[in-house]
Swiss-Prot record:
Family: Belongs to the universal ribosomal protein uL1 family.
Keywords: Repressor, Ribonucleoprotein, Ribosomal protein, RNA-binding, rRNA-binding, Translation regulation, tRNA-binding
PROSITE patterns: RIBOSOMAL_L1
Annotated gene: rplA
Molecular function in Gene Ontology: rRNA binding; structural constituent of ribosome; tRNA binding
Known function: Binds directly to 23S rRNA. The L1 stalk is quite mobile in the ribosome, and is involved in E site tRNA release. Protein L1 is also a translational repressor protein, it controls the translation of the L11 operon by binding to its mRNA.
InterPro entries per record: Ribosom_uL1_bac-type, Ribosomal_uL1, Ribosomal_uL1-like, Ribosomal_uL1/biogenesis, Ribosomal_uL1_3-a/b-sand, Ribosomal_uL1_CS
Protein name: Large ribosomal subunit protein uL1
Biological processes, Gene Ontology terms: regulation of translation; translation
Xref: Pfam families: Ribosomal_L1 (PF00687)
Organism: Borreliella afzelii (strain PKo)
One GO cellular component term: large ribosomal subunit
Assembly description: Part of the 50S ribosomal subunit.
Length: 226
């Protein structure tokens, strides 16, 4: 058995799988059982009770940011392009950027487009769609309000969505952060998820919540806002 494997098993043994931990206790336990030297990301997995026709998808700006600044690419022309540059977009262009991306360039993290550009940007569907970067009005990345879009993205606005199995996976902190700040991010995220409850859903919406660190075991968190 590898040294890493032994440490994981030791950490795993400290988690009571039959217990529902408070978020405060769960965060403390994650830090207690940490066995790697790097600054781990803290993730959440929310299992939802959804029907096949239900979609849960939105964006959120957490109160306490922890991720590296993202490179924002904006497809726009004329005055809109000038606005995007003024508001701090990393890359701004139209056909030039479309052709560059077609050639294999991928040094960007978020894509925003003005509505008039979407017909042309649509040609990049197979490329951007594969990376989950296709601009979409639902994620506020197709807009003429570039100031608000870019500012919120620079503040860390991030998309979350439930997969086909009704599970939302999302990163909401780093192990180096203060426990209270991790908790604040958790509470803000759960609040936003609860808002997305389908209007026709009967019964429980959130089935279970687990948090984990990059290398650590998952910990089940109690949920009291059903």
């Amino acid at each position: 058995m590898s040294k890493k494997g032994k440490k994981y098993i030791e950490a795993f043994s400290k988690v009571d799988k039959s217990k529902f931990y408070s978020i405060e206790d769960a965060i403390s336990l994650l830090k207690e059982i940490k066995f790697v030297k790097f600054d781990e990301t803290i993730d959440i997995s929310v299992n939802l009770n959804l029907k096949k026709n239900h979609t849960v998808r939105d964006t959120i700006v957490l109160p306490n940011q922890f991720m590296k600044p993202k490179r924002i690419l904006v497809f726009a022309k004329g005055d809109r392009a000038d606005e995007a540059r003024a508001f701090g977009a990393t890359y701004v262009g139209d056909d030039d950027l479309i052709n560059k991306i077609k050639s294999g360039w991928d040094e960007f993290d978020i894509v925003v487009a003005t509505p008039d550009m979407m017909k042309d940007v649509g040609r990049l569907g197979p490329i951007l769609g594969k990376r989950g970067l296709m601009p979409n009005p639902k994620t506020q990345t197709v807009t003429n309000n570039l100031k608000d879009a870019i500012n919120s993205l620079k503040k860390g606005r991030t998309e979350f969505r439930a997969n086909k199995n009704g599970v939302i996976s999302f990163s909401f902190g780093k192990s180096s952060m203060d426990n209270e700040k991790i908790k604040e991010n958790y509470e803000e995220f759960i609040k936003e998820v609860v808002k997305k409850r389908p209007s026709d859903l009967k019964g429980t919406f959130i089935d279970s919540i687990y948090i984990s660190s990059t290398m650590g075991p998952s910990i089940r968190v109690e949920f009291v806002w059903r």
